[in-house]
Every structure is written in C-alpha cells, then in structure tokens.
Amino acid sequence: MKSFVKFIRTYRKGEIIFAEGSPGQEMYVISSGAVKVTTTKSGKETLLARMGTGEFFGEMSLVDAAPRSGTASADEDGTRLVELDLDRFLYLVQQQPAFALTIMHTLCERIRKRDALYLELLGKSGGEQSPAADETQAGEQGGAL
C-alpha cells in the first residue's frame, strides 16, 4: 500500500511554512492548530485566510504549477501539519474521486468568498462593477455567460 504522507511536522507560532512566490511542490492538511495565509503588497501585509484543524492549503500550486500566492505561517504553537507531495496528490486525485471532489468544492467555496468580498469592496469604494463582476453575478443567478 502506498504511503500518502510525506511527513508530519510541528510548527511554532509565527514559523513560516512557505513563502509567497516560492515554488509549490506540496500541500498541507492541518492535523491540529491553526495556520494563517498572508500576502504582502507595497510593504503592507494582508490576511488572506485563517484555517484550523481539518482544513487544507497549498493545493493551488499543485493544481496550476504557479508560485505560491501567499505566505503561510503557523498561527498557534504546536501546529501539526501533514504534508502531501505532488506525486501523492496526483495519485489521490486519480484514484480517489471523493478527494478530488473535496478539493474542487473547497476551491469553489474560496472563489465565491473572494468574489463576494470583491463586490463588497467595490460597492464601498463607489466604483462601478467590471464586466467580469457582472458576468459572475449573472452566472450565480442562473444567467447565461
């Protein structure tokens, strides 16, 4: 039987798991503790996500081979992470449809949350919606794109 776990590691609060812009060859499942993901633009750090036990992160770089979109760090002392490398990830996606569906569901959930935040921020700034935002709303309301 194939071993799915590259390794389990424990992190201290504030310890960097991966840095924004670095290549991604693994994803992580939070066994215990918490992780935060941030991005830094023009010297300003912005919180993208805070996650806890049972959640996963780092999968985007495995799916699209792009560099990491944010910096992940432990948000609690004793945060334990299970690391899956690219080979194990691809094996699970191919052999375990439920795993692939979980990844897709979570990605869709995250996209919808970001879309909602974008539209909320756009409304607060008094700006007009872009055509892409109009299409997103139409799609969510069952309209044709």
PLM features per residue range, with description:
Residues 1-38:
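Regulatory nucleotide-sensing modules
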Residues 7, 31-33, 47, 53, ...:
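A generic structural signal for short beta-strands and their flanking turns/coil linkers
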Residues 14, 33-35, 54, 72, ...:
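Short hydrophobic/aromatic patches on the structural cores and recognition surfaces of FHA
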Residues 35-48:
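A short beta-strand-loop-beta hairpin characteristic of the jelly-roll/cupin
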Residues 49-104:
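Cyclic-nucleotide recognition modules
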Residues 88-129:
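A small-molecule sensor/coupling module
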Residues 120-145:
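Phosphate-/nucleic-acid-contacting segments
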